[in-house]
């Protein structure tokens, strides 16, 4: 499903983002990628979505070699990925329904299908009664649920979450983590980047730890992982 083979990435300023990284993630796995600031977590995500390319090595996503993909095929790659960010990135002037529907409108889905898919995903994330609300009327946890709904409305094969609980209180963070578990249980591969060790222990999933652009640990259960 996802594979990094000896991936090396250096930015123009000379900083090494990833150094000889090899990772294999099976279809349907839930994997946490952890590390301090500058460890290489953000670059890892950017490589998955072809936002950046490696200087050497191979990146496979959904059985596609994204290091060799044609630029015309990148939008099709990204349609199979759902991405959730720490800062939600909702459109403030659009309702909850419209924010989620936007992800389908850009791929020219039919209005009837859009309505059905959006209502279904709103029920999944527990926001059926918030469809007509604006983001400013929602709590932080509710805004993140909208962002998650938008990311999964097109049924991606892989859901990528970049510090999704970073702006949330502990209980809301656990609620959001439970939602990611439910999405994973439905068959979606989940890759979550986080530095929140409480969430790592709570989720109790496979943990890949990065430090200085290298994989320093790859453990099958988060409860056994402790940040130095």
Task: Indicate where each model-derived feature is located.
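Conserved ABC transporter NBD signature motif
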Residues: 57-65
């Amino acid at each position: 499903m996802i594979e990094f083979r000896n991936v090396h990435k250096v930015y123009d300023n000379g900083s090494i983002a990833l150094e000889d990284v090899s990772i294999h993630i099976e279809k349907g796995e839930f994997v946490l990628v952890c590390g301090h600031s500058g460890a290489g977590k953000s670059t890892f995500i950017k490589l998955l979505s072809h936002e950046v390319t490696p200087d050497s090595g191979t990146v496979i996503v959904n059985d596609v070699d994204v290091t060799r993909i044609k630029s015309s095929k990148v939008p099709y790659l990204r349609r199979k990925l759902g991405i959730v960010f720490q800062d939600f990135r909702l459109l403030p002037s659009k309702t909850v329904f419209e924010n989620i529907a936007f992800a389908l409108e850009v791929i020219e889905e039919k209005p009837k299908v859009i309505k059905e898919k959006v209502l279904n995903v709103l029920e999944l994330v527990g926001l059926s009664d918030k469809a007509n609300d604006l983001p400013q009327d929602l709590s932080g946890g509710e805004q993140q649920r909208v962002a998650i709904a938008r990311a999964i409305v097109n049924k991606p094969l892989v859901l990528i979450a970049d510090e999704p609980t970073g702006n949330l209180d502990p209980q809301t963070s656990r609620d959001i983590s439970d939602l990611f578990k439910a999405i994973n249980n439905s068959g979606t591969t989940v890759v979550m980047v986080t530095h929140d060790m409480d969430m790592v222990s709570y989720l109790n999933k496979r943990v890949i730890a990065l430090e200085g652009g290298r994989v320093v640990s790859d453990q099958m259960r988060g409860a056994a992982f402790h940040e130095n």
